[in-house]
Amino acid sequence: MIRNISKSIVNLNSQKIATNTSFKELVLESKKPVIVDIRPCYYTPTKFLNKELFEAIKEKNDTFELVTIDFDEEYELAKLLKIQSFPTIIGFSNGNFLKKHTGPFRSKSHILEFLNHIETEHKKKY
């Protein structure tokens, strides 16, 4: 089960990179809602989405943690999360899976819609 993954942290700029060993600490134990971006690092369309996602999170006054998982480096973790295509974004709150989006967002407003849903669900838990 995902909750049994042990701890360690790797930071890259203000974005966090989850590894098999850091997933529990970065995602499941976070006090903030977490947006997990799963992608292979070489895949250009997801780099554009990552920039848009980062900007949308900034607009939300850093209400969220943004965590990236490199599909190629962390294949077993991606497999646990049942990732089958890219880009895939997953929202977590209080260690619980809330929502998954696979494929590109049509616009920044759709990214904000996704974030609003996660934020609303997170507030219900507190």
Swiss-Prot record:
CDD domains listed in its UniProt record: TRX_family
Classification via SUPFAM superfamilies: Thioredoxin-like (SSF52833)
Principal subcellular localisation of the protein: mitochondrion
Subcellular location: Mitochondrion
Cellular component annotations (GO), alphabetically ordered: cytoplasm; mitochondrion
Transport is among the record's keywords: no
Domain Thioredoxin: residue ranges: 14-120
Domain of life of the native organism: Eukaryota
Key words of the record: Mitochondrion, Transit peptide
GO molecular function: protein-disulfide reductase activity
Family: Belongs to the thioredoxin family.
UniProt-recorded name of the protein: Thioredoxin domain-containing protein, mitochondrial
Native organism: Dictyostelium discoideum (Social amoeba)
